[in-house]
Amino acid sequence: MSYVIPAPKQPAIAVAGTDATFPVRRIWCVGRNYADHAREMGHDPNREPPFFFQKPADAVVASGATLPYPAMTKDLHHEIELVVAIGKGGVNVPVAKALDHVFGYGVGLDMTRRDLQQQAKDLKRPWEMGKSFDQSCPVTPLHPAAKIGHPAQGSIWLKVNGEVKQQGDLNQQIWRVEETIAYLSQFVALEPGDLILNGTPAGVGPCKAGDKLEGHVDGVGDLVITYAAEGAARKAA
């Protein structure tokens, strides 16, 4: 069988310490999973069921990249997150077995065009243009859980131009990784290659052209992204 157009390139993430890569199938993001962040966004951080939104698989971009400032926004925000890479699929996964489905972990950014997201919220429309744009998901190489275990506590932070903007601890997650996996698997079949970004701590805020972003999760890794100086050309069709 042949395709009528060239097949899209398979998005993938490096696996730390190897020449292998992890193919990305889908990207799920958990909304408001740290109490302080929920409050700063104007919500009550109780244990309501988590909610999810998606980014396209090809939104992933490797740590270390210099990126063009995204189009159509004047309010680009950073959100540092623990990235969970699914290595074994399943549906209705029990909480007690959920971590068996994890291949490994990374550090990622849920970059957000906050002005477009807010416009969509005000109009009661979907968030895709605010969340699901090109290169909106920088990610570090993944570390297999077989080597680092399953991080449930430890510092998670983000700096902009050397100044700490976000600071939290993984133990502040309202929904732990295993709970998120179990709940999401009730609605969709999880498959190898799925990523889950498990929420961001307080301190989300704007970044501009020329800014350097540095993120960290204890025991998982360090992420660095730079936005090109103002005037850098975006690739045209």
Show which residues each predicted segment covers.
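Extended, compositionally biased flexible segments
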Residues: 1-102
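Catalytic-pocket segment enriched in acidic/His residues
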Residues: 2-22, 33, 37-45, 106, ...
